[in-house]
């Protein structure tokens, strides 16, 4: 039963972040700014590292509504969310993963889209 | 043709989902300046694909930086050209997201509550929060009314009408939060609710009926065919007579006749010919008459008149018997003298 509640909580959290991200996207000025964007073709254990990369880049977006931007960053840092994307394997948790700078540069629109896809991927794995 | 048709139907219904297949990529070296890789050979794409390529077997896939557009969709990618490229293996990858279609929902059931409230329940093909469902219903075969999609597996009809017939159908897809599937599933098997009877009538008409119709017609056709074959086989001799008429050959019948020489042989052997083997000749009494000269005129006239009646009877009996014997010539000779 605990596992079920845990699952429901996590999925609700993920849903919340995805919705907030969409709100944020509406208020961002997509003026062609380029950001390092992690790809989705990454190893399972590098999920968390990719999320961290995204989380450090979000504040760089030019958003008119700062409140929602801060909320998104806060949620991406949350323990609950991190537990969703964490790796099961003990070995090489953050070892073999790419550094944030090594990911290709994409414009802000692509960046937000990729982050949403990453969160959706996590949600599909969960439910 | 019906056999093929029914097999095709089975194959199609067994398919879980239909996914438009990823198009083929064709790459062309343009004037030793660059490489154009396109995927619009089989028609303009209706979705945006992501293109990747790599020049070396070992190495990472690189995403396309210069997409070629047509009607607001990406149809190809322009790659930079290297002199050795024509002698290398170029590996390409075309990726499309959310090309997905679910099975339709199953186990539909309707029940009327105390309120009164008409509730529809169903099961989605997968038990996950990622699926949203859409309900449509019609009252007494009027226009379909569609609900807003929701993640519940239950739907309540607002203020149901009395003495009406409701027909329900449900379909599902992956919701937007989880990465929306491009296609809705097919509509589920319909279910009917008749407020008069207060019953759950699962409408079996539709695809299941058409399956039955196909099967029955197939069985019927095969049965008829087998029966026809059997009839033809039984009556094959008679049919042969009708279709290929026999040419009469009198030679066969008269073969034994023509072989024999004597008349006696004819009489005894041939039965079909019109000779009477039991012919007995009736003996006719013959009398000789002489003219005695007493007085010239009277005696002549008397002798002329005296024709024996017996002889005329004889003659008649002989000629009446069915024969073509040359016996009559003897009688004639006797009469004159």
Language-model regions, residue ranges each:
Chain A
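Extracellular/luminal segments of secreted precursors and ectodomains of membrane proteins
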Residues: 3-127
């Amino acid at each position: 039963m605990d596992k079920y509640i845990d699952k429901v909580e996590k999925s609700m959290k993920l849903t919340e972040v995805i919705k907030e991200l969409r709100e944020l996207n509406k208020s961002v000025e997509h003026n062609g700014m380029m950001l390092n964007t992690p790809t989705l073709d990454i190893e399972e254990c590098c999920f968390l590292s990719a999320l961290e990369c995204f989380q450090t880049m979000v504040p760089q977006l030019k958003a008119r509504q700062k409140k929602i931007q801060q909320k998104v960053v806060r949620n991406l840092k949350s323990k609950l969310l991190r537990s969703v994307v964490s790796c099961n394997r003990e070995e090489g948790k953050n070892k073999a993963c790419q550094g944030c700078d090594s990911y290709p540069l994409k414009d802000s629109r692509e960046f937000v889209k990729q982050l949403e896809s990453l969160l959706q991927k996590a949600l599909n794995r969960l439910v | 043709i019906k056999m093929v048709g029914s097999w095709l139907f089975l194959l199609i219904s067994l398919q879980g989902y239909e996914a438009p297949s990823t198009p083929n990529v064709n790459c062309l070296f343009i004037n030793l300046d660059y490489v154009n890789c396109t995927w619009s050979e089989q028609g303009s794409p209706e979705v945006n694909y992501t293109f990747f390529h790599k020049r070396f077997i070992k190495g990472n896939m690189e995403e396309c930086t210069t997409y070629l557009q047509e009607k607001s969709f990406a149809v190809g990618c322009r790659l930079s050209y290297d002199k050795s490229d024509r002698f290398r293996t170029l590996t390409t990858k075309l990726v499309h997201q959310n090309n997905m279609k679910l099975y339709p929902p199953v186990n539909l059931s309707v029940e009327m509550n105390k309120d009164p409230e008409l509730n529809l329940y169903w099961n989605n093909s997968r038990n996950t929060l990622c699926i949203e469902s859409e309900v449509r219903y019609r009252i007494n075969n009027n226009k379909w009314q569609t609900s807003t999609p929701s993640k519940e597996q239950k739907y309540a009809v607002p203020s149901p009408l009395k003495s009406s017939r409701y027909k329900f159908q449900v379909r599902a897809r992956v919701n937007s939060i989880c990465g929306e599937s491009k296609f809705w599933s097919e509509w589920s098997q319909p279910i009917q609710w008749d407020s008069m009877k207060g019953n759950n009538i699962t409408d079996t008409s539709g695809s299941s009926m058409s399956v039955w119709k196909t099967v029955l017609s197939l069985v019927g056709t095969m049965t008829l065919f087998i029966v026809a074959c059997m009839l033809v086989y039984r009556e094959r001799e008679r049919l042969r007579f009708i279709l290929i008429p026999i040419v009469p050959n009198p030679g066969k019948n008269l073969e034994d006749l023509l072989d024999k020489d004597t008349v006696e042989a004819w009489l005894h052997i041939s039965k079909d010919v019109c000779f009477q083997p039991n012919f007995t000749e009736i003996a006719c009494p013959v009398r000789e008459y002489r003219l005695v000269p007493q007085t010239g005129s009277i005696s002549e006239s008397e002798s002329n008149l005296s024709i024996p009646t017996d002889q005329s009877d004889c003659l008649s009996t002989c000629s009446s018997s069915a024969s073509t014997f040359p016996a009559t010539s003897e009688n004639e000779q006797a009469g004159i003298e």
